[in-house]
Regions:
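A short helix->beta-strand "capping" segment at the edge of beta-propeller domains
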Residues: 22-40, 72-75
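Surface loop/turn motifs at the tips and blade-to-blade linkers of beta-strand repeat domains
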Residues: 35-40, 80-84, 120-125, 161-171, ...
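Short loop/turn segments that connect beta-strands within beta-propeller blades
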Residues: 70-74, 112-116, 152-155, 202-206, ...
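Signature of short aromatic-glycine-proline-rich micro-motifs recurring in repeat-based ectodomains
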Residues: 44, 174-176, 225-233
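Beta-strand-rich domains and repeat architectures in extracellular enzymes and scaffolds
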Residues: 33-65, 80-81, 85-92
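Conserved beta-strand positions in repeat-built beta-propeller and related beta-rich domains
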Residues: 55-61, 93, 98-105, 138-145, ...
Length: 333
């Protein structure tokens, strides 16, 4: 009887705790704040905000450029065109320079941000897609699920991580990147090529932290198979500028739960349980155990007497079952 009372008290408590931990989804939403003009001839490859201006790289052979843009009016403040053999890709600001990747040239160009002239370059192997700077390292994508962490001074690869979802599946076609500094550590927002979504992942281990549906914004600009969502620039706090290839608009949006990360909230794969319900049930558990102990001892004594009368051959030992062991196409980014 005491055991039944004990379980009847514990069951609803643990059920409520389990529901609060696992059944309540974390919302990731893109909220449109304002819409602004964007040059629809710009095949956007990279987007970065610095000192109030948007820096944008545009791609395609013969049309690649680096430009400074007023985000509110969309007007180009200054621009530099690149050699027709260069297909520009993602960019990031590092100190007083802008680092620009190229698609297949295996060269990253370094521009002086003051006059947009090339001052140096780095070589790398494979394709270049997106890049961002997290305050310590350069983080670079190549259109697969692999992300390289690089030294900003030498461009050498320090390590490579694979971006995966909560089931361990690789997330491919990772494109333009935007690094975000949070209290939990560096985080990266990424466009997925030809997909209306932006993901948030941890660059230290590649784990997916958030998935944002941007289809409502992409639908406003669905005028070609290559005119896809591409370009994320951090404005402030949870606000970001986003646009796409040959889009006629750029959007200031709020991305929910980005600020939540900054407040130290835990999204997935948390090592500690900080649910206040766990703390609240401790006094109840102690009271229940104290109340149940006398009855449990009385039951144990009665059971031992009865067991002495049972033939030893009738003893049954529950067997534990053996544990079962857990067993890119691209046509011009």
């Amino acid at each position: 009887m005491a055991t039944l009372i004990f379980l009847s008290i514990l069951f609803p408590i643990f059920t409520a705790e389990s529901a609060s931990n696992y059944d309540t989804p974390v919302e990731y939403e893109i909220v449109l704040l304002s819409e602004h003009y964007h040059d629809n001839e710009a095949f956007t490859q990279g987007l970065e905000m610095h000192n109030g201006s948007i820096y944008e790289s545009t791609g395609l052979y013969g049309s690649s450029s680096l430009r400074e843009v007023d985000p509110w009016s969309g007007q180009v403040i200054r621009s530099v065109s690149l050699n027709e053999t260069i297909f520009s890709e993602g960019i990031t600001v590092y100190n007083d320079t802008i680092i620009m990747l190229t698609w297949k040239s295996e060269v990253a160009y370094v521009f002086d941000i003051k006059n947009l002239t090339i001052v140096s370059s780095f070589s790398y192997q494979g394709e270049g897609w997106g890049i961002c700077y997290d305050g310590k390292y350069l983080i670079m994508s190549n259109g697969t699920s692999s992300i390289s962490i690089r030294d900003p001074n030498s461009f050498n690869v320090l390590r490579v991580v694979t971006v995966t979802d909560e089931l361990g599946n690789r997330i491919n076609k990772i494109n333009e990147l935007e690094c975000v500094t949070t209290e939990e550590g560096p985080r990266v927002l990424a466009n997925i090529w030809q997909d209306d979504r932006i993901i948030l992942f941890d660059p230290s281990n590649g784990s997916l932290l958030g998935d944002f549906d941007a289809s409502s914004i992409s639908e406003k600009n669905s005028n070609g198979i290559n005119n896809v969502l591409n370009g994320i620039a951090h404005h402030n706090s949870s606000e970001f500028w986003i646009t796409g290839k040959n889009w006629s608009s750029m959007y200031l949006v709020s991305m929910t739960n980005i600020s939540g990360v900054e407040e130290g909230n835990c999204f997935t794969g948390c090592g500690q349980n900080n649910n206040p319900t766990s703390i609240a049930i401790i006094p109840v558990l102690l009271m229940t155990i104290t109340f149940s102990l006398p009855f449990l001892f009385m039951y144990r004594k009665t059971r031992d007497v009865k067991n002495q009368q049972i033939d030893e051959t009738n003893n049954r030992h529950d067997e534990l079952l053996d544990a079962v062991p857990a067993s890119q196409k691209r046509g011009g980014d």
